[in-house]
Amino acid sequence: MEFIVSDISQLSPRPVWAFFDQICAIPHPSYHESQLAQFIIDWAKGRGLAVRQDNAGNLFIRKPATPGMENRKGVVLQAHLDMVPQKNENTDHDFTRDPIRPYVDGEWVTADGTTLGADNGMGMASCLAVLDADDIEHGPLEVLLTTNEEAGMDGAFGLEAGWLTGDILLNTDSEQEGEVYMGCAGGVDASMHFPLERQAIEGDLARFTIGIKGLKGGHSGVDIHTGRANANKLLARFLSHHLDNVDMSLLAIRGGTLRNAIPREAFADIAVPASQKDALAGAVDRFATLLQDELGRLEEQVTLVMESTDNATDPLTRAVQSRLLAALNAAPNGVVRMSDDVPGVVETSLNLGVINTEEDKITALFLIRSLIDSGRENVQSMLQSLASLANVNVEFSGAYPGWKPDPDSEIMHIFRDTYEGIYQRKPDIMVIHAGLECGLFKQPYPNMDMISFGPTIKFPHSPDEKVNIDSVGHYWQQMQAILKAIPVKTA
């Protein structure tokens, strides 16, 4: 399809889309939010708003209540500054330098070959639009914009008591209009390290890159139940199955880019005796047919490629290669258990998100999620057992708590009542199998009442990401209704 530049700033509601258009123009992948943060600081100061930044890089912006609303409970509008940097293989894009190129595609806004950053740029845009507005009724207002949510929740981990004064927090990082979230999964990162040993092999060798491509990928929390294929797991399966009958020697393996994204592509550099390159090609063709038979209805674009490579490094020793591929092939992945308490919601899962070959080791990166601590601990035990069998190390880091639902939440009831008043139907009250920052916010602010909501965003964390235009208008209308309905603060 020919790319057509669209002026999304003219979409309705214009205040939100205009800010989102500006956000798209400023690079802000995880770990590189400083340029966008400085833009927002300068903008807030220009509007006469009080703005501060803490040691974690989080931004805090305050706006006084509108006349007559000074006695209402304080509200914190919250979003995160960073976006997931994912692109198609044939897309030339540097996320640290190049702007996102959004365009209108029917009822949606998407981007040209990259993630759009509607997660959480649309929430950020709505927060700024409220700060900028002179015609929205609200009580004492704060905006909290956190850093590096997508790659470690660094800003949420670094948030300290005393910076916020509000009673209610509205997290804008949910992705289905008409749903409101009152709980989320916790998680922990796992890193499994395979020390490398290499050995030279003699003979006439042919060297190839074998690649899994064309998978849908997606968010390892909200999309994990869909059964979308994991490129790292498929590649490990192929290599393990054909390890002996094609006499492959592994040079390097790589796949995925983020723990919290289902990997769409994975590649292995291998060497085979020149006499066996036809056998390898046959194995590739057979596995490609198998993938189409197994996954074709869900993963219509899945392909297996075989191309020559100039990787001239010595292969791994047979012992290291066998141990590595057996572990990757055996590693659990996907849904581990569905919740008994919340029907239709995943309780526990894990995602083999990244495999990297480094100078002295190969590292596999997982993200474990669970609504309950014991579920997370069970999967950690699985990976510890796998590492023990493979005689390698596994490390766990970055654990963050879940967000326990509060059935008596006042802001939840306000959301429900205002939503029904606007749309004459009930919203869906949800618990999400993904990590929202609210669980971490509860540690320094245990008494803060919280919900999460947002417009409809499909395929976050992938180049197919898109946001529904009409849903942004509904979300904006709902946000204004909530702010107007915030009750008077009592002692």
Q: What does each model-found stretch correspond to?
A:
Residues 2-108:
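Acidic/His- and Gly-rich active-site-bordering loop/insert found
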Residues 8, 13-16, 340, 347-360, ...:
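Zn-dependent metallopeptidase/amidohydrolase metal-coordination segment
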Residues 27, 107-110, 150-151, 157-369:
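Midchain, well-structured core segments that form catalytic/ion-binding scaffolds
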Residues 69-151, 156-167, 318, 329-333, ...:
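Active-site metal-coordination/substrate-binding segment of hydrolases
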Residues 70-71, 274-283, 373-379:
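Short, conserved charged micro-motifs
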Residues 223, 230-232, 236-253, 405-448:
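Active-site-adjacent substrate-binding region
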Residues 228-245, 274-277, 323-329, 337, ...:
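His/Asp/Glu-rich mid-to-C-terminal helical/loop segments that flank catalytic regions of hydrolases
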Residues 345-434:
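Substrate-recognition/cap regions that form aromatic- and gly/pro-loop-enriched pockets
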